[in-house]
Amino acid sequence: MMKKTLSIAISAVVALAIVCTLIYMFAFRTLTVVSDSAFSLVLPKSTMRDLRSSMFFKGIRVKTAFLDDEAFDNAEAFKTSLGKVKGSYVLLGPVSSAYAESKRINVSDLLNESTVIAIYGKKSSLFDCVLVSDEKSGWVKVAQELSSEFEKTAQNVALIYENDAVPYVQDIKDCFSDSRLTVFEDDTQSRLFATETLKKTDELSIVVAMCPYDGHLSDFFKTTGTLSWVVDYRFANAVPKKQLYGIVVPSLSRSLKAVLNTEKGASAVSNLEYDYEKL
């Protein structure tokens, strides 16, 4: 009798699992993230895990579609590859979005059964919605957390950036008292900047540096160092793992929640918000 009861219970669980799987596969709407060799290399796996979890509770299944390098050979190859993508929503990565814009490919028309969302720098009629990157929001969070973290220590935090490349420097500075932040502005474009900066951070016993952008970032790692770094997620691979303190990453889940109700053909604009992920 017990074996029969157990068998019935197991069968019921299996049946429920099958039903849930069918609901997930066929009843849920679909968000397809269009990736490429560049985007897949730098986008943290944690970002996609968070997106899948967040969208699940919205009744949306997340999947990915990959465009290989040949898809960017010419406009026709791009349209052929992208035209195969299906989904209630289609999110284009930065490279795909920029390519479509450069070739003036109307992706909203190409994928006429999907709401097309692009990661791009400005409003465009080629997509149904554009997420404009707001890196400042992420770097302000970094500054606030590091300011709080090192408030009771004798150590300063460094801000290293390339001249004129980071428009929100003052917003970062405002999170610190003048005595707790040491700023290194790369305005010489000299390769000696990295050597001189590392020497100075060592003299000041600085252990963590924020670097929103510096074209010479790799110069800081030509020799073994102890300085820890917070960088944009796109440059994380340039930093030795043992020196990577944190990254600033796009919050796809939070940003997409705000645009799920976008109507087809709306040419809407919204912010792509960023978060600080301490490693």
What are these model-derived regions, one by one?
Residues 9-23:
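Hydrophobic membrane-insertion alpha-helices, especially the h-region
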Residues 32-76:
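Extracytoplasmic "Venus flytrap"
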Residues 34-35, 86-97, 117-119, 158-161, ...:
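Periplasmic-binding protein-like
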Residues 72-88, 106, 190-204:
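Short, well-structured alpha-helical segments in soluble
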Residues 105-133, 234-241:
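Flexible loop/hinge segments that line or gate small-molecule binding clefts
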Residues 123-148, 240-253:
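Short beta-strand elements at the ligand-binding edges of bilobed clamshell
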Residues 137-180, 266-279:
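An alpha-beta-alpha
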Residues 227, 233-279:
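Flexible loop/turn connectors
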